[in-house]
Every structure is written in structure tokens, then in C-alpha cells.
């Protein structure tokens, strides 16, 4: 499944400069930060929303408020192949 994560970032250098340790079966094909780094959207391919939530919230700590949802693949356009 594809999962969207939306980020409101208080420390862009730390957030976007960090490295995620992706668990087996999870991919991150798209990262789209705003010009100033204070907002961003990522597309993950993973087994569940909770896997992505635990990964991002665990890595970001208090420097980002995050939202997550599963993409409705039947109505989506342009998902990574």
C-alpha cells in the first residue's frame, strides 16, 4: 500500500538532513519539501499506515507534527511504478 505523510517542521535542517532507517518492505519513492523546508509531503510504500507512523514519529521526535493516511490507489494518479 502507499501511505502519505504530511509534515509541519520546526527544524528543517535537522528534519530533512536526517536519514531514515527503513524497515524491510518499506520504500520511500517520493520526498517533497517546501522551498523553506517548513512543510513537506512524502509517499511511502509499506505494509501499513502504522508502520510509517512509527517510523516517522520515532525519527522526527518533537521537530515535526505529522499526519498520515493510506492512498486510495483506485483513484490516485501518478503513483510510482
Where are these predicted regions, by residue range?
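Short S/T/G/P-rich N-terminal loop/turn motif that feeds into the first structured element of a domain
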Residues: 1-39, 45-57, 62-64, 68-81
Amino acid at each position: 500500500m502507499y501511505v502519505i505523510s504530511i509534515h509541519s517542521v520546526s527544524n528543517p535542517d535537522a528534519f530533512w538532513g536526517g536519514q531514515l532507517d527503513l524497515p524491510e518492505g518499506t520504500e520511500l519513492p517520493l520526498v517533497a519539501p517546501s522551498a523553506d523546508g517548513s512543510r513537506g509531503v512524502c509517499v511511502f510504500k509499506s505494509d501499513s499506515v502504522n508502520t510509517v507512523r512509527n517510523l516517522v514519529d520515532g525519527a522526527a521526535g518533537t521537530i515535526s507534527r505529522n499526519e498520515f493516511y493510506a492512498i486510495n490507489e483506485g483513484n490516485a494518479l501518478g503513483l510510482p511504478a
